[in-house]
């Protein structure tokens, strides 16, 4: 148990333009009002008399918070770590890191920044040089380097210019705070008391100009810029460095982290993911790793728990053979990474090292991550962690608050690979910000992206908040889910009225949840996983099954929307896999049009109830064939929407967007398939069977046969039979099944109650169904069978 030794320094007084600290406080001084430094003009040369407010529950009041050790250095490493670091310096995997540190320290600079005509003169090369010199002193007692580091930092601070209109300028401001904290801690005994106070002033004055408006902590703890470096790395580092001289900084930063960051991370890390997706997810995950490393080096390991180490698996499983990830939320990777270059998992090297995970470490090495950030890679990365490739199970379930299943047929990493990758998402919580309205979404890749998300995050018509962004890109209409259109429904984003796409509502009007209390008490819950299973082999499963209820993602226009996915590894070189999607949608008004969506890059071809989607060019050569079994032929409308001038259409109005440059890896999906029933009804069933293959004219798709009984609907494809309950409920009733054909079929029946089920007609065949899986499977030749729930234990 951590002992709380937080020191309370309630007052600072301004003397000779510098902040001095008072250890003894009178009762009257303790009652001084909080002074808001942000109300003053923004000027780094002005020193403010900051009176810190009393800690509240949001800042960890009454929590047992760990405190920094009484020694220097203590930020990122301690004296006891130096022998191991010296051994690491000689490791054959570390020469790039050490060389970069040495080269940075040797940079010819006195720290002074150019000011001629500049509004913003941040210089990361000088930052790196200052930190490298400070490290040379703390690590090797190089006195000359230490003195040069401090002198250069003083010059840097005096000549720094900040353009407060620069986008995301808080990231630059925070980086300077970090450098000040590092020099303060690593060169502590070279700095006089007066100079220490100057550095503290500088860090506080910079801190008040962050978006979190230090010490207000104006932003949230779950999502948004407030969860990035500002608090997690920059102000926390400042607090650790100056704890003995001004503990209020640490108390405030650490208090918010332990009160709000920690429970939120434990909540979503349980699902082995970060909710901000394929770009912002790993970007923000790295800041949580900084918190982990700061505390670990102070002697407090794994403050977020071991689940943090599993987060990179979300991106490992969503990686396509072309080196990219399935798109998840706002994605900037596809806009700025050239086609053909492997996308990286930010933080994989640190996470793989810290949690001793060979699979994650292999990702980092394959992505050539180690050595680019010489100093921090040297401090945080363990080159002795082994690597492992291609041994993970092909299916992985990511539980609530995500509720997603990723299924693969292999781990191929070439664009010509035969590996199929699919994602099936229920989506239990929507955290807003960069997350999309995509509950129920699916994506498929085989020799090219075949079923994908649509839209462009940033482009010539704008970025976050543009018309394209709020009316199309973040909306359900841009995903492979279901639309239920109430013509009178209103949609808004932060109070801004939007086009009616018929999809899901922005939770809480798109406002970001500040903390767990808001997340759990407001309407951020979008779904519930009802069942999930894969098997029979756990490493190479033949089937992967996921089912959920999605009514919470929609307005009251929907009574129920249950979606079931079954991914089949067919082990067939011509048609390697299939994805079956079964939907039961119950709307409150029979006239609300229901539309099943599939987005693709090239124009689809529709022949009766069969749609073909190909992906050619750029080295791709894949094809998807979708057979629609429900709605039935007489009640079926299939149409394609898209093409030039109609790429991102909502109810006939296009919301255009264009990438900034041609050298990108954007999928560029400008077509979609819409499947709807012709007749109005409250309850509609949808059953779509997608199979993938090479895009050769001679390559024929498998025969797809519909199966329907009074209670079940399903499909026979290849040697597989898959059945779903038509009413969407779990059943304990007996099932009659007639199998015809000249082969042995692998049967999967979903929506069955847990317990033992006997297959009459197959000698001694009893299937055990586990609670939460609600699926039974067996193999059987042609014949008549009755499956009965047994009372035997």
Where are these regions (language model features)?
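Catalytic and substrate-binding regions of extracellular carbohydrate-active enzymes
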Residues: 369-611, 615, 680-695
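Terminal accessory/anchoring regions of large secretory-pathway or extracellular enzymes
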Residues: 536-539, 549-554, 566-793
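Aromatic-lined, polymer-binding surfaces characteristic
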Residues: 74-82, 94-319, 324
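Bacterial Sec-dependent N-terminal signal peptides
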Residues: 1-30
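Glycine-rich (often Gly-Gly/Gly-Pro-rich) flexible segments and glycine-rich loop motifs
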Residues: 328-365, 477-484, 489-519, 613-649
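Mature N-terminal, pre-catalytic/accessory segment of carbohydrate-active enzymes
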Residues: 27-96
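Carbohydrate-active enzyme catalytic cores, enriched for enzymes
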Residues: 242, 282-451, 678-685, 697-777, ...
């Amino acid at each position: 148990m951590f002992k709380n030794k937080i020191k309370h320094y309630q007052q600072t007084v301004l003397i000779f333009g510098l902040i001095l600290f008072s250890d003894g406080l009178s009762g009257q001084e303790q009652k001084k009002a909080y002074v808001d430094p942000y109300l003053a003009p923004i000027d780094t040369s002005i020193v403010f008399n900051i009176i810190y407010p009393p800690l509240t529950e949001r800042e960890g009041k009454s929590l047992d918070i760990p405190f920094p050790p009484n020694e220097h250095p203590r930020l990122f490493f301690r004296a006891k770590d130096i022998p191991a670091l010296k051994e690491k310096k000689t490791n054959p995997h570390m020469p790039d890191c050490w060389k970069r540190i040495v080269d940075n320290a040797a940079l010819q600079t006195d720290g002074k920044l150019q000011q001629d005509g500049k509004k913003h003169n941040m210089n990361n090369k000088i930052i790196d040089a200052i930190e490298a010199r400070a490290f040379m002193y703390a690590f090797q007692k190089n006195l000359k380097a230490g003195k040069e580091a401090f002198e250069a930092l003083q010059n840097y601070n005096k000549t720094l210019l900040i353009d407060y209109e620069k986008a995301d300028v808080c990231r630059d401001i925070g980086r300077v705070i970090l450098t000040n904290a590092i020099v303060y801690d690593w060169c502590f005994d070279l700095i006089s008391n007066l100079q220490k106070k100057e550095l503290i002033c500088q860090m506080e004055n910079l801190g008040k100009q962050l978006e979190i408006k230090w010490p207000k902590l104006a932003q949230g703890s779950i999502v948004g810029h407030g969860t990035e470096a500002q608090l997690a790395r920059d102000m926390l580092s400042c607090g650790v460095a100056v704890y003995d001289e001004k503990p209020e900084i640490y108390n405030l930063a650490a208090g918010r982290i332990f009160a709000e960051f920690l429970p939120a991370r434990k909540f979503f890390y349980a699902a082995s993911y970060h909710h901000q997706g394929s770009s912002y997810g790993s970007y923000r995950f790295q800041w949580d790793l900084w918190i982990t490393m700061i505390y670990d080096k102070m002697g407090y390991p794994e403050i977020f728990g071991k689940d943090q180490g599993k987060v990179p698996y979300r991106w490992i499983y969503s990686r396509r053979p072309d080196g990219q990830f399935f798109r998840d939320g706002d994605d900037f990777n596809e806009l700025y990474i050239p086609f053909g270059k492997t996308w990286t998992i930010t933080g994989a090297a640190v996470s793989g090292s810290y949690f001793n995970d060979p699979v994650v470490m292999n990702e980092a090495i394959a992505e050539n991550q180690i050595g680019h950030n010489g100093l921090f890679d040297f401090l945080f990365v363990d080159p002795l962690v082994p690597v492992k490739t291609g041994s993970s199970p092909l299916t992985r379930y990511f539980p609530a608050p995500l509720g997603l299943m990723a299924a693969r047929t292999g781990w191929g990493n070439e664009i010509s690979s035969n590996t199929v990758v699919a994602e099936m998402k229920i989506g239990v919580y929507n955290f807003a910000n960069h997350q999309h309205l995509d509950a129920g979404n699916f994506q498929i890749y085989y020799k090219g992206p075949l079923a994908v998300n649509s839209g462009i995050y940033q482009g010539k018509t704008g970025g976050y908040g543009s018309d394209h962004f709020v009316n199309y890109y973040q909306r359900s209409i841009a995903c492979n889910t279901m639309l239920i259109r109430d013509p009178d429904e209103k949609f808004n984003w932060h109070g801004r009225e939007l086009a009616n796409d018929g999809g899901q509502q922005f939770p809480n009007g798109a406002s970001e949840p500040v903390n767990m209390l808001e997340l759990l008490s407001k309407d951020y819950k979008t779904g519930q996983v009802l069942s999930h299973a894969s098997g029979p082999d756990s490493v190479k499963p033949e089937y992967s099954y996921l089912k959920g209820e999605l009514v919470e993602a929609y307005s009251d226009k929907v009574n129920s929307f249950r979606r079931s996915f079954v991914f089949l590894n067919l082990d067939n070189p011509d048609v390697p896999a299939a994805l079956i999607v079964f939907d039961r949608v119950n709307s409150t008004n029979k006239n609300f049009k229901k539309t099943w969506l599939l987005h693709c890059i090239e124009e689809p071809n529709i022949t009766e109830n069969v749609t073909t989607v190909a992906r050619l060019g750029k080295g791709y050569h894949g094809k998807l064939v979708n057979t629609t079994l429900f709605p039935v032929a007489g009640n079926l409308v299939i149409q394609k929407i898209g093409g030039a001038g109609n790429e991102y259409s909502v109810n006939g109005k296009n919301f255009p967007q264009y990438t900034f440059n041609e050298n990108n890896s954007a999928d560029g999906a400008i077509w979609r398939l819409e499947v709807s029933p012709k007749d109005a009804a409250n309850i509609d069933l949808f059953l779509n069977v997608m199979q993938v293959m090479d895009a050769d004219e001679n390559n024929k798709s498998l025969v797809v046969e519909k199966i329907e009984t009074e209670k079940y609907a399903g499909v026979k494809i290849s040697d597989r039979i898959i059945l779903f309950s038509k009413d969407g409920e779990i059943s304990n009733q007996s099932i009659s099944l007639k199998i015809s054909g000249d082969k042995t079929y692998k049967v999967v029946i979903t929506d069955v109650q847990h317990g033992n089920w006997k297959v009459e007609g197959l000698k001694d065949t009893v299937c055990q169904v586990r609670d939460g899986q609600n699926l039974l499977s067996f193999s059987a030749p042609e014949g008549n069978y009755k499956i009965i729930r047994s009372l035997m234990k």
